[in-house]
């Protein structure tokens, strides 16, 4: 299955709690942290919910 590189580019401080949980669910911990996640509908949903804090490649 394909993977997607996701990087956290903005702080989670003061954000909507559900968006913070989506970032945590993707495995991101700090600004500049990059992870590769499987390109599944579940992960795409989390990315779409918090897109304004992320950079997505692939």
From Swiss-Prot:
Pfam families: Ribosomal_L30. GO terms for molecular function: structural constituent of ribosome. Belongs to the universal ribosomal protein uL30 family. One of its GO terms (cellular component) is large ribosomal subunit. Part of the 50S ribosomal subunit. SUPFAM superfamilies: Ribosomal protein L30p/L7e. This is Large ribosomal subunit protein uL30. Keywords: Ribonucleoprotein, Ribosomal protein. One of its GO terms (biological process) is translation. It comes from Pseudomonas syringae pv. tomato (strain ATCC BAA-871 / DC3000).
């Amino acid at each position: 299955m394909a993977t997607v590189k996701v990087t956290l580019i903005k702080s989670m401080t003061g954000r909507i709690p559900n968006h913070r949980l989506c970032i945590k669910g993707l495995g991101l911990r700090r600004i500049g942290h990059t992870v590769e996640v499987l390109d599944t509908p579940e992960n795409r949903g989390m990315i779409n919910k918090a897109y304004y804090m992320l950079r997505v490649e692939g």
